[in-house]
Amino acid sequence: MPGIAAGLPPAALSLAYLAAAVLFIHGLRQLTHPRTARRGNIFSAAGMVVAVGVTVLWFEILSPMVLFAGLLVGAAIGSWLAVTVDTTDMPQLVGLFNGFGGGASALVAGAELVDLFGPSGPTVAPVETTTAAAATGLIGGVTFWGSLVAAGKLQGYVEDPIHYPGENTLKAAFFGLAVLAGVALVTQIGISLLSAATWVPSYWVLVAAASILGILLVVPIGGADMPVVIALLNACSGLAAAATGFALDN
């Protein structure tokens, strides 16, 4: 149900989303050149503020005070990082931002499952929702922990590749565990609806396996190749966010 913007016509919501999309597209275009990249970041950030702000206010997801408080905290942290982080350390910061995006997507998908499988939720969830949530948990877990390791390697904490006997077998085992947990989630095997504390254990098994897999995938790679890894994880962060949108049916 519409919240604070209840007096506005439904078309206003569509126009706000359209404006956000235009800001995103223009921001991405500006990011293609170093001279305009700063403006591109500003346009993209403005698009995100419009999209998130309109959504949470229109559907009463958060109160305006909570929304503005979150914006202030985020702006303060971002400003502090912009001032204190050296230009040469920007790749590490970008890697951390990628990881936070993937981790946030995994948490949002988990929250959606809590809402679906809680005591007041449905006994059967749409398969498209559980499939998207499983994809989000897998990609988000790999992205978050892989990005943390990549940022640490770029920072020089552990630059050399780490190899150990049976590393490929171990990676395959955790990937297989994540896939099995995802299948259990999608087919809704072993889901308990008794209380909010026993919902969908398979999702968190999937996230845990994906998190370990993200670490195992990055530690054998040398520090010199971390920019490539971070670029790949950046794309994965976007995929996780897109999958979260499908999980939320938005």
Regions found by a protein language model. Name each.
Residues 1-64:
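N-terminal transmembrane signal-anchor/hairpin module of polytopic inner-membrane proteins
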Residues 7-21, 58-76, 129-144, 196-209:
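Structural signature of hydrophobic alpha-helical transmembrane segments
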